[in-house]
Design a protein with these regions (language model features):
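Single conserved hydrophobic/aromatic residue that forms the stacking wall/gate
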Residues: 1-11
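Conserved Rossmann-like nucleotide-binding pocket used by diverse enzymes
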Residues: 3, 61, 184
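A generic alpha-helix preference that emphasizes hydrophobic side chains
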Residues: 7-8, 26, 97, 177, ...
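Catalytic pocket-lining loop regions of alpha/beta-barrel enzymes
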Residues: 15-147, 158
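Mid-to-C-terminal alpha-helical segments outside catalytic/metal-binding sites
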Residues: 132-136, 140-147, 154-191
Length: 191
């Protein structure tokens, strides 16, 4: 089909979520009671809020914390990026039709550099570097609208599968059993 495009085109079109064709497609998903899983970079969170506002009957799942970038021109700006990301996540979480999928921060694009280590990251290293993203999302969206996700096999370059799930247990240790059930099972089932 002449209208189909490759993955590379997605990266060239930073405003794709705002196009009429894209939003017509989202309307169809909502009509069919399907979900839209959104993955974009941190500077595009406001576009997810816009499509959530335009499509209130559509469940949108925010993937990978909306991809906070930590490489290239963003390298070394972790705290600056986190502050902007935090503000935008708080605003996005006001949309009841948006759920948060918690995981996928072990990718090289996020700049934590776990993939460069001699051995895969430990759960304690993950807690040290990423805890603030997890806790901010859980606080903003509340546990009932959050679900842990592995993002395997992509995360395999940085962390082992069982260590990742141990990390999730450490992140959630101070939450109630009901809240843990939401994040480990109920929210995903609801979606």
């Amino acid at each position: 089909c002449s209208q189909s495009r490759g993955l590379g085109d997605v990266y060239k079109r930073q405003d794709m979520y705002l196009s009429d064709v894209f939003n017509q497609s989202l309307k169809i998903l909502g009509e069919k009671d399907l979900v839209f899983e959104a993955w974009q970079y941190h500077h595009q969170i406001n576009q997810v809020a816009e499509i959530a506002d335009r499509n209130e009957d559509l469940t949108i799942i925010l993937n990978h914390f909306s991809g906070p970038i930590g490489i290239g021109p963003y390298e070394g700006k972790e705290n600056e990026i986190f502050k902007v990301w935090q503000k935008d996540i708080k605003e996005l979480s006001k949309r009841p039709n948006v759920l948060a999928k918690l995981g996928g921060l072990a990718m090289p694009v996020n700049g934590f550099k776990f993939h460069e280590q001699e051995t895969p990251a430990t759960s304690d290293q993950m807690v040290e570097k990423q805890k603030r993203y997890y806790l901010e999302c859980i606080e903003s969206f509340e546990p009932s609208r959050c679900m842990f996700e592995s993002n395997f096999p992509v995360d395999k370059q940085s962390i082992s599968y069982h260590v990742l799930w141990n990390f999730f247990k450490k992140i959630s240790e101070n939450f109630s059993e009901d809240e843990k059930n939401s994040m480990f099972y109920d929210c995903a089932k609801k979606a």
